[in-house]
């Protein structure tokens, strides 16, 4: 009579477990596909992360104005400029976080219904930060409660000067590219649908005109815009240096592949993850995630980081870049690393 050992695993179960362990081990050691081919300029080259000025530094000057970007450049000449683009009725790409003018200016209406020429001729002021629930116009103030005029900007890059001492004129993407010909610029397409696709087309035209493929990042939270980036990348219509980041769902896709150990099968050609430190209670800034992205040659850029402790945590974990509304605050911390 055979004796059974109580609790002994069935051979089939053992085999299944061994197969699963072997599969995960194989996935771990398989070389990760390179999402971005060649040297990725969005990855840091030393210990310190790259400073990214969110909307030019939205806490120090009115965001998405040329003056804000001048201020950011005065803090760090290597700064990455982050901005938002919308296309006007007459086909000009202007910088603005919302698709309407209501929050940031002294006029109302969707940007797609305004001509850029009218914005300039009417001297529309982009120096406001109006509350959505109020009809009252509120001029931008810094964190100390001070109203900031363009004339308050002290340091202009060589060869450049102020446009208007009192108001913040509409800023175009082309102006930004010309003002900072050496800096990387991250552009988020804010409009969706056909209007957003028109904005992408015009941005591509400008990038081609100025041969700026190696310094423009294309971004969007709109899934249809991200799908267009993927299509352009896979179709060969853009050079290999074309850089883009995923939409929210695109980022979720990468994180899901990473969490389940399936990132060896991740094939989207993104150059950078532009993500928060946490989303839906899930931490996204661990050393492990950052290192895993690096194996795919994907840079990790975190937004919008205004707390000093968060900045230090990201530095410790090895983030490639930190996006902030306060360039001076982050620069002070980064300078402290060098001492």
Predicted feature residues:
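Phosphate-group recognition and catalysis centered on beta-loop-alpha active-site segments
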Residues: 2-339
């Amino acid at each position: 009579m055979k004796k059974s050992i109580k609790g002994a695993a069935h051979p089939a179960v053992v085999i299944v477990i061994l197969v699963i362990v072997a599969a995960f081990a194989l996935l771990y050691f398989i070389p990760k596909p390179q999402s971005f081919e060649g040297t990725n300029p969005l990855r840091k080259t030393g210990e310190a992360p790259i400073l990214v000025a969110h909307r030019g530094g939205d806490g120090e000057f009115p965001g998405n104005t040329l003056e804000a970007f001048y201020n950011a450049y005065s803090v760090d000449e290597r700064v990455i400029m982050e901005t938002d683009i919308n296309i006007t009725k007459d086909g000009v790409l202007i910088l603005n976080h919302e698709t309407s003018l209501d929050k940031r200016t002294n006029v109302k209406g969707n940007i797609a219904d305004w001509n850029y020429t009218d914005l300039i001729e009417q001297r529309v002021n982009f120096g406001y930060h109006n509350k959505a629930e109020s009809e009252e116009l509120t001029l931008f103030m810094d964190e100390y409660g001070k109203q900031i005029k363009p004339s308050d900007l002290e340091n202009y890059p060589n060869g450049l000067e102020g446009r208007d001492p009192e108001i913040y004129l509409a800023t175009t993407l082309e102006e930004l590219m010309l003002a900072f010909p050496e800096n990387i610029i991250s552009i988020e397409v804010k409009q969706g649908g056909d209007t957003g696709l028109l904005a992408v087309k015009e941005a591509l035209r400008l990038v081609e005109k100025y041969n700026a493929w190696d310094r423009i990042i294309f971004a969007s939270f709109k899934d249809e815009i991200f799908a267009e980036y993927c299509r352009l990348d896979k179709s060969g219509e853009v050079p290999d240096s074309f850089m883009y980041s995923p939409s929210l769902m695109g980022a979720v896709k990468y994180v899901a592949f990473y969490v389940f150990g399936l990132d060896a099968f991740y094939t989207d050609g993104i150059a950078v993850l532009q993500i928060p430190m946490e989303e839906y209670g899930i931490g996204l800034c661990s050393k492990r995630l950052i290192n895993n992205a690096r194996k795919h040659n994907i840079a990790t850029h975190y937004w919008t980081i205004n707390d000093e402790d968060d900045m230090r945590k990201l530095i410790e974990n090895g983030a490639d870049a930190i996006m902030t509304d306060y360039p001076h605050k982050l620069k002070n911390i980064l300078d402290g690393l060098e001492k």
